[in-house]
Amino acid sequence: MKTVGDKLAPFAITGVKPGQPEDAFYTITENSFEGKWKVIVYYPKDFTFVCPTEIVAYDKLAQDFEDRDAVLLTGSTDNEFCKVAWQTAHADLKKIRHHQFADTQRGELSLIEQLGVFYAPAGAALRATFIVDPNNEIQHVTVNNLNVGRSPEETLRILDALQTGELCACNRTVGGETLK
């Protein structure tokens, strides 16, 4: 698994634009969103129980991530058509404002394989979060088992702390003081 300090290698995944436009699909690579931080959130599967709670909770903070020059990307190994169908079928997902992705490739350009979060026994991604700086260097990684959801507020808190470039105490709140 890639970890803090590792750089993203070339990859290509299918992005799904927010708001279900006609031209919803596009390619996301390591060069997409130049100059931005990337918060990459993997979840196991579309049409499940825990996953939409995470996606909706992350989306509620989408503007907070954007305010920090970060692009929020949530996705799984389900294909792009599955994502659009899920967004159409699930009332809360119809309103999401962030980019989703389908990581269906295997091999050289597979992001999930590069990051090491494909969980073969389930045929799905682990609940993994990567915060990647504008130079494509991983600054933070968390990985949960399939049954435990994450705290988007904690992800935002860590992003905010990383962006200070300073020492940050435990439980430092977003925008809080750093250690001098």
Residue ranges and their predicted role:
Residues 1-180:
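Chalcogenol-based redox active-site neighborhoods
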